Amino acid sequence: MSLQSYDKEIFDLVNLELKRQCDHLEMIASENFTYPEVMEVMGSILTNKYAEGYPGKRYYGGCEYVDGIEQLAIDRCKQLFGCEFANVQPNSGSQANQGVYGALLNPGDKILGMDLSHGGHLTHGAKVSSSGKIYESFFYGVELDGRINYERILDIAKIVKPKMIVCGASAYTREIEFDKFRAIADEVGALLFADVAHIAGLVVAGEHQNPFPHCDVVSSTTHKTLRGPRGGIIMTNNEEYAKKINASIFPGIQGGPLVHVIAAKAVGFKHNLSPEWKIYAKQVKANAKKLSEILISRGFDLVSGGTDNHLILMSFLNREFSGKDADIALGNAGITVNKNTVPGEKRSPFVTSGIRVGSPALTARGMKEAEFEIIANKIADVLSDINNTDLQEKIKAELKELAHKFIIYDRATF
């Protein structure tokens, strides 16, 4: 029986979401459009199989084929990042980070990560996260120019003396210099852990500095710029750390892995290893650069004055409207972004003074600089007359027409 026949309520909602994804311009920096092949294997019979343990060391029988699947995912992941060991079982980036901490830290150990309000992530020590409750967390941030000051981080690290330094961000527009973080970690005797969830797709294409060999451990998600399924991975070159990480994931924080998702990760990695991937990653950066150039030319302030990667941060500290206002207005015009805090933030995190805008999803649809120039100007038009709902409706219709020239899915399920 088809989903439409059995559960029309869910079928209708899923297809409404398909329509939204086709009609709107997805510019949330952490979102992307995955491949049909990835979704096909996620919807396979692999969802039926329990496989507690690791390839060759399972607690269940009948794992001979899923062993092959997981090993393929591991091997492709290692090839992608140029590392010796990889764990592909984490169900998310947050669980990957939790697994790293559990493997290499003891409760109460000090960690030094990027402040959430400066572009870090909840799992980098934020007090509302388990990473900020189990461990003693300290923070570094960006300067008012929106850039990391590595000398300032060294000064903080000398005072804090952390067991681990966490580098990586969810809203940082410039290249992260892992070699400089390595020098800081060495000077204070700290472990160095990189969370490259946002930039992984650029890293594996050679469009961003690789965290290896500089970092002791690296985590990532497999969606975002990698365009794979939703999930996490952990990598290292240290065999002792690898064993501890494996134990920290299973049986530490997870039971049976999601075999259908691990298979989808393997399929995604095959895409990432293809020559076409480098073309995609270059285009992601080129599109973000075009976006930043146009918005600056239209008189808008960008944190750090531009971008080196896949995203920009627009600052409205000198405007009467907030990030929340901009988020809503652009949504009404058919452009999906998210409100975001900015350096020097004066509003609450529920309102903010900025928005985060990314290029990966629209690049996946096939859009290039010409389309991003159009889109950037439409963003500027909306924000220059933010209360003009008639203009928002007009632009929404225009952008829907543009979006329909770049349809990526013709159905909702695979």
UniProtKB/Swiss-Prot annotation:
Enzyme class, UniProt record, top EC level: transferase
Name of this protein: Serine hydroxymethyltransferase
Post-translational modification N6-(pyridoxal phosphate)lysine, affected residues: 224
Compartment annotation: Cytoplasm
Its job: Catalyzes the reversible interconversion of serine and glycine with tetrahydrofolate (THF) serving as the one-carbon carrier. This reaction serves as the major source of one-carbon groups required for the biosynthesis of purines, thymidylate, methionine, and other important biomolecules. Also exhibits THF-independent aldolase activity toward beta-hydroxyamino acids, producing glycine and aldehydes, via a retro-aldol mechanism.
InterPro entries: PyrdxlP-dep_Trfase (IPR015424), PyrdxlP-dep_Trfase_major (IPR015421), PyrdxlP-dep_Trfase_small (IPR015422), Ser_HO-MeTrfase (IPR001085), Ser_HO-MeTrfase-like (IPR049943), Ser_HO-MeTrfase_PLP_BS (IPR019798), SHMT-like_dom (IPR039429)
Major location (coarse): cytoplasm
Catalytic activity: (6R)-5,10-methylene-5,6,7,8-tetrahydrofolate + glycine + H2O = (6S)-5,6,7,8-tetrahydrofolate + L-serine
Cofactor list: pyridoxal 5'-phosphate
Pathway in which the depicted protein is active: One-carbon metabolism; tetrahydrofolate interconversion; Amino-acid biosynthesis; glycine biosynthesis; glycine from L-serine: step 1/1
Pfam family, one: SHMT
Residues carrying the site annotation Plays an important role in substrate specificity: 223
Recorded family membership: Belongs to the SHMT family.
Gene Ontology CC annotations of this record: cytosol
This enzyme's EC code(s): 2.1.2.1
Species name: Campylobacter curvus (strain 525.92)
HAMAP family attached to this UniProt entry: SHMT
Alphabetically ordered keywords of this record: Amino-acid biosynthesis, Cytoplasm, One-carbon metabolism, Pyridoxal phosphate, Transferase
GO molecular function (one): pyridoxal phosphate binding
A Gene Ontology biological process term: glycine biosynthetic process from serine
Residues the record lists as binding (6S)-5,6,7,8-tetrahydrofolate: 116, 120-122, 240, 348-350
Subunit structure comment from the entry: Homodimer.
PROSITE patterns cross-referenced by the UniProt entry: SHMT
Regions that span the bilayer: none
